[in-house]
């Protein structure tokens, strides 16, 4: 999904809101939806979705020149490289969090090796990558994601 979603983060929200119920959410003067507020919950911070931001674009592109497949003795080594481009068309700088995911091997004979993550935080259990970045007004940034998958020749490797 290449859409960019705005999210409002409200820390210590129960200090400001003492009654529960439905709340209407507006952003830039436009109605974006409803949410239920339930005081006494276990979370002290609440996240509210503000919808899609058309002023921020993101594109993930496979770099074919840096993708390859090599045969090594009894294994095949697949290399994948992607470029993630983020563009801020707003008049102000933005804080952005980008998520992607590396494949997770279901078989012990398959090895996924992280090569280039452009500083992403990686979760070993889920394979989720997270980048946090500031992009100045009317500017763009690029991230590189490169990984290798080594698998036995007899095995067909598929990604979901």
Question: What are these language model-derived features?
Answer:
Residues 128-140:
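A surface-exposed beta-strand-loop module
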């Amino acid at each position: 999904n290449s859409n960019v979603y705005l999210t409002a983060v409200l820390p210590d929200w129960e200090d400001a809101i003492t009654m529960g119920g439905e709340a209407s959410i507006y952003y830039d003067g436009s109605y974006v939806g409803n949410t239920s507020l339930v005081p006494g919950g276990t979370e002290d911070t609440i996240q509210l979705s503000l919808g899609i931001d058309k002023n921020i674009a993101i594109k993930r592109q496979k770099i074919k020149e840096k993708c390859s497949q090599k045969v090594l003795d009894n294994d095949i080594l697949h290399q994948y490289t992607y470029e993630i481009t983020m563009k801020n068309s707003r008049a102000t700088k933005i804080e952005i969090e980008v998520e992607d995911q590396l494949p997770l091997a279901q078989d012990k004979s398959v090895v996924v090796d992280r090569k280039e993550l452009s500083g992403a935080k990686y979760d070993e259990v889920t394979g989720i990558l997270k980048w946090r970045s500031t992009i100045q007004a009317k500017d763009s940034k690029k991230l590189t994601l490169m990984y290798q998958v080594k698998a036995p020749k007899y095995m067909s490797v598929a990604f979901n």
